[in-house]
Amino acid sequence: MQTVLIALLRFYKLAVSPLLGSRCRFYPSCSDYAREAIQYHGAARGTYLAARRLCRCHPFSAGGIDLVPPPNSDARNAPHEAEASSHRL
C-alpha cells in the first residue's frame, strides 16, 4: 500500500502539480511532506499526517517550515500552524 501511495504522489508531482503551479504555503511542499510522512510512518499514519497538513494549507494560513515529525514522536507534538508561522520562509 505504501508503494502505491508514493507512486500516486509522484504522478501528482510530475503530471498535475506543474499545471496548477506552486501554491503551497509550507516547506516542504504538501506533496513532499506526504511522501516523507508515508515513508517514515507507513501508509496509515503517514496518510493521517498528510491529511492534517493539507487541512492547515489554505489561503489564510501563514505557512512556514513544517517538517514531518520523527518516527518515534507523537503526532500531537508536531508543529502547529502557530509555531510554523514563526518560521516563515
UniProtKB/Swiss-Prot annotation:
Cellular compartment(s): Cell inner membrane
Membrane topology: Peripheral membrane protein
Segments of skewed composition (Basic and acidic residues): 77-89
InterPro entries found in the cross-reference section: Membr_insert_effic_factor_YidD (IPR002696)
Similarity comment text for this entry: Belongs to the UPF0161 family.
Domain of life: Bacteria
Organism for this UniProt entry: Burkholderia thailandensis (strain ATCC 700388 / DSM 13276 / CCUG 48851 / CIP 106301 / E264)
Classification via SMART domains: Haemolytic
Region (Disordered): 68-89
Alphabetical keyword list: Cell inner membrane, Cell membrane, Membrane
Record's function text: Could be involved in insertion of integral membrane proteins into the membrane.
GO cellular component: plasma membrane
Protein name (Swiss-Prot/TrEMBL): Putative membrane protein insertion efficiency factor
